[in-house]
Amino acid sequence: MKKIAILALSFLTVSVAKAQDAGGLRIGIKGGATYSSLSGDQASQIAGPAFDNDLGSFKLGYNAGIGTSFPISSDGFFSIAPELLYNRKGYEVKSKQMAGTSEIEVEQQRVLHYLDLPILAKINAGGLYFELGPQVSYLFGSKVKQQTTTKNANGTKTKVDNDGSFQDYSGVKRGPSDKSDLAQFDIAGVAGIGYQTDGGLSLGLRYAQGFNSLIDSKNTNNDPKAFNNAFTLQLGYLLPLGR
């Protein structure tokens, strides 16, 4: 009985050691911070052609979801890593327009709720890894906050926080949660670098550049070209499932 117990313990030890090989099949969770904005020569025109716009800084959001890693070489040097992530992206734009002798400033912040599906090729070199590949994103929600400041010629000014209703690029008024002026899907290229321990803990930094223009008012053929771009910093734990 004692010999059987020793053999069983030895087998379990070897199995765990193999399962913890960084090159084996893994599945787990990932999450972290997202810093996003818009890019493109026409990105500053998203509030409409009548406005002089200035894109704000990158907006802070977050991401969380499921990650996997499938080895495609026996030593684990190459692997494929599909993920399914919720990603809170967005942008900020400040617009100015003259109305008679008054200057109207509109500050608009827009939150974009995405489901991201990156499918990345990974090179695993010791704990260090590099990743590159495409990402498909589905926009399932949007929320707008807007503040209007009117500066009068006599030096007075008034600030109004509206209910989030806004006019899109083509001049159509939309509600704060309306996303019909935006493209529903995005295709992006992703590149990243990170470190993963043999036990499955990881820290990674990646950049995603969208290739499909975000603005799609569907009422004009002259929508400005503006593309999502985002940096993400992720912590993860991928449970080894063996090879």
Go through each PLM region and give its residues.
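Sec-dependent N-terminal signal peptides
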Residues: 4-13
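Sec/Tat signal peptide C-region and signal peptidase I cleavage site
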Residues: 15-19
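Outer-membrane beta-barrel "beta-signal"
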Residues: 26, 227-243
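Membrane-embedded beta-strand positions of outer-membrane beta-barrel proteins
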Residues: 29-31, 80-84, 119, 130-132, ...
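Transmembrane beta-strands of outer-membrane beta-barrel pores
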Residues: 33-37, 86-90, 125-127, 136-140, ...
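Extracellular/periplasm-exposed beta-strand and loop segments of Gram-negative cell-envelope proteins
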Residues: 37-59, 89-113, 139-186, 211-232
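Transmembrane beta-barrel domains of outer membrane proteins
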Residues: 67-71, 120-124, 194-196, 204, ...
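Repeated loop/turn-to-beta-strand initiation elements of outer-membrane beta-barrel proteins
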Residues: 76-78, 127-130, 199-205, 241-243
